[in-house]
Amino acid sequence: MDVGSADAFDRMGTLGVEEEFFVVDDSGQPTAGIQELIYDYNHPPAGVLADRLDHELFQFVIETQTPLLEDVSAVSESVQAVRDALVTHAADHGYRIAAAGLHPTAKWRERNHVEKPRYQSQLDRIQYPQHRNTTAGLHVHVGVDDPDAATWIANELRWYLPPLLALSANSPYWNGFDTGLASARAKIFEALPNTGMPTRFEDFEAYYQLEKRMVETGSIKDRGELWYDVRPHTGHGTVEVRTPDAQADPSVTVAIVEYIHALVMDFAARYADGESGTKVRREILDANKWHAMRYGRDAEFIIPGSMETVTLSEFVDRETNRLGVDGLTTLLAREGGAKKQRRLHASDNIDTLLESLCLDTDT
C-alpha cells in the first residue's frame, strides 16, 4: 500500500522545486519528445538532471526536480542550473523547451499520452477529465520537522493560494482558443478527482487516515493522486504547494518559491507559539480561487471573517512588509503572464507568442 508516514517529517526549512515544461519544435509547437529526452540510453539526462527528469501524462510534457536545497538562498542558482541543463539536453536532441500553465496551441485530441502503466490506469479510471489534462504547474516543497505542524501550516496556507494563483496566472489559451480566464489550467486541472482547495484537517492523523482510506478503498492508486492545491507530503516530509502555473521566466519561479518558503517558516513559528489557526469556510476559499483563475491580476479576495475584500496589490504590499520579501512586489510591477500572452497574440501573431514561452529566448 503506497502511503506515507509521519516519520518523513524530519527536516525544517529545506526546499525542493518541481517545474513542468513543454517539449516543442523549432517554431515552439508542441511535439512528442520524452522518448529521446528521458529514455535515450546513449545520451541520458546527466549532471543535475540525472534522476531528476521525468515525463508527465502527455508525451510533450516533462518535469524537472531540483536537488534537495538546505537554504532558500540556493533556490535561484539551482532553478537556473536545472533549466540550463534541460535546454541544453533538449537542444542536443533537436528540441526546445517552453513553459506556461497551458500550451496555447496544444490540442489534446491530437497529442499522445505516455504508455506508463500509472498514467494508463488513471486514463482508464478517470476518463475525459484526465484525457484532456495538458496542464503544467509549479510545485514547491518546504520541509517541516513535525507532521502536525505541517498539517496546520497546510490549513493556514489555503487562504494565500488564490493570490499566488493570480500572480502566476499565464494560461488564457487552451486547445487553441482564448478561454476568457487568466488561468485556464487551474480550471481544467480541478476537474480531476481529489483536486482543488482541500478541507481543513484537524491534525496529521486526520490527513493520514484520509490518504490511507483512499488507497485501501481503491479510490486512488497511491498517495500521489491526492492532487490538492496544498498538502502535507507524507513521502517527502514537506508542505507541498501546487497552485501556481508553470513559468517561462526563472525569476518569476524564484520569487514565488521564496515567498512560499517565507510563508511556511512564518506559520511554523506561529504554530510553535501556540496559535489556534484561522477557520475559513471552504466556499470562501473556492470563491477566491475562482476570482484568481478568472481575473488574474485584477482579482479581489474575500478576507476571512469579514465582509471586506483585498486587492492583489494590497495583498502584495501587506505580505512584503510582513515577511520582508520583495520578490512579489517586483513580480506585481511586471506585466502579468495572461495579459502578456493576449497582447502578443493580438498585436503580432501566434509565432511571437510561442517564441516568448521558450526558455532559450529573451523575448
UniProtKB/Swiss-Prot annotation:
Question: In terms of domain of life, where is this protein from?
Answer: Archaea
Q: Which UniProt keywords apply?
A: ATP-binding, Ligase, Nucleotide-binding
What is any one GO biological process for this UniProt entry? Answer: modified amino acid biosynthetic process
EC main class here is ligase
E.C. code:
6.3.2.2
Give one Pfam hit by family name.
GCS2
Annotated coiled-coil segments of the chain:
none
Q: Which GO terms describe its molecular function?
A: ATP binding; glutamate-cysteine ligase activity
Q: Which family is it part of?
A: Belongs to the glutamate--cysteine ligase type 2 family. YbdK subfamily.
NCBIfam families the UniProt entry points to:
gshA_cyan_rel, PRK13518.1
What is the protein's given name? Glutamate--cysteine ligase
